[in-house]
A protein has these predicted regions:
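C-terminal functional modules
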Residues: 247-310
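Pocket-flanking alpha-helical
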Residues: 41, 60-95, 178, 198-204
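A bilobed periplasmic-binding-protein/Venus flytrap-type ligand-binding module shared by bacterial periplasmic
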Residues: 108-118, 222-236, 259-260
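Short helix-initiation/N-cap motifs at beta->coil->alpha
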Residues: 32-35, 53-68, 166-178
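A conserved helix-loop-strand patch within extracytoplasmic ligand-binding domains
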Residues: 95-147
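Short, well-ordered beta-strand elements
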Residues: 23-36, 53-58, 135-139, 244
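Ligand-binding pocket segment of bilobal, Venus flytrap-like solute-binding proteins
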Residues: 74-78, 149-213
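Ligand-binding cleft/hinge of the Venus flytrap
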Residues: 44-51, 131-165, 278
Length: 310
């Protein structure tokens, strides 16, 4: 993992350059393979592109996101889920700036199918009582994901008697496929669940109680998602920073976009993001308040609105 991280950071060095009005106008996003963060990144990319910025986005793991922000090889990450990323955020807090909360009302914790919940598994402490039915496994996401690290912490410290359990490292699509199959067979499965996500519509599921400060937070997985940037970004990009501070999403809006992606596999996240933006142009007034084009001369709102007419 360490070697892989170093290789990615070296690659990022060729992408970064500091920019202000009148110079190169390149903005670099970093994101992870979570549908919601991907959609938000595509929307931000589209708008900034119309304003005259050259915009790129690199897909990596959560730890690499923070390392790249620290080394100033990328600029922006729209996926700082809190409190689950608290540990890595604290590690890098002197090298990043929290610009805004781009979504509240989110959830991130362990989940089970509704039939399992109704059979008595409603709390983390209920899991081990039914260890055999779960095959002592919890299905997680990609390596390096903070949710995985929380589950490992629970297992390694025997929280909720989970010392004999196994974390199954996977990916969002693979985990969802596994959960879908097991639900179709009425099997018992515990997995990382979150909202917004179309899994909440795909599956009749329930979130477990029992989360603590050391796990998914003290409010049973209730979360916020922040926009974070590298140090000095606000000073170098005041115009983009104003836009990012204004950029806010509702859980419902992300759920709707995710559901459309799920229903139509031919669509790419960019297609859905731009379509949704076209259908919700009223948000642009708020998002682009106080924002100019990249050269500092044009009306950002007018430019983006005009783009939907072409």
């Amino acid at each position: 993992m360490k070697k892989f991280s170093c290789i990615l950071i070296l690659l990022f060095f060729v992408l970064f350059s500091a920019q202000v009005y009148g110079k190169e106008r390149k903005v670099n996003f970093v994101y992870v393979s979570w549908t919601g963060v991907t959609l938000k990144t595509e929307i931000a990319k589209y708008i900034l592109g119309k304003l005259g910025y050259t915009v790129s986005a690199k897909l990596v793991s959560v730890p690499i996101c923070y390392m790249a922000l620290k080394t100033k090889n990328v600029d922006i990450f729209l996926g700082n889920w809190m409190p689950v990323q608290r540990e890595i955020y604290e590690k890098y807090k002197n090298h990043i700036v929290k610009l805004a909360t781009n979504m509240d009302g989110a959830i991130y914790t362990l989940a089970v199918p509704k039939y399992v919940y109704e059979a008595g598994v409603k709390h983390f402490k209920d899991l081990d009582r039914h260890k055999d039915k779960f095959n002592a496994k919890i299905y997680g996401l990609e390596e390096g994901n903070m949710g995985n690290e929380v589950i490992r912490y629970m297992i390694n410290n025997n929280l909720f008697s989970l010392k004999d359990w196994e974390l199954v490292v996977s990916s969002e699509p693979a985990m969802l496929s596994q959960v879908k199959y097991m639900i179709s067979q009425k099997k018992w499965v515990a997995f990382l669940g979150w909202q917004p996500h179309h899994m909440n519509i795909m599956f009749d599921m329930a979130y477990l109680d029992g989360s603590t400060k050391e796990t998914f937070g003290e409010n049973n997985g209730e979360s916020i998602v922040n926009t974070i940037v590298r140090v000095d970004f606000v000073e170098e990009y005041p115009n983009v920073s104003t836009f990012l501070k204004n950029l806010k999403f509702s859980v419902d809006s992300i759920n709707k976009m995710m559901l459309e992606l799920y229903k139509d596999k031919s669509l790419e996240p960019k297609d859905v993001a731009v379509k949704w933006l076209n259908e919700n142009k009223s948000l642009l007034k708020k998002w682009l308040k106080g924002v100019k084009t990249a050269d500092g001369k044009g009306d950002a709102y007018k430019i983006v609105m005009d783009s939907f007419l072409n």
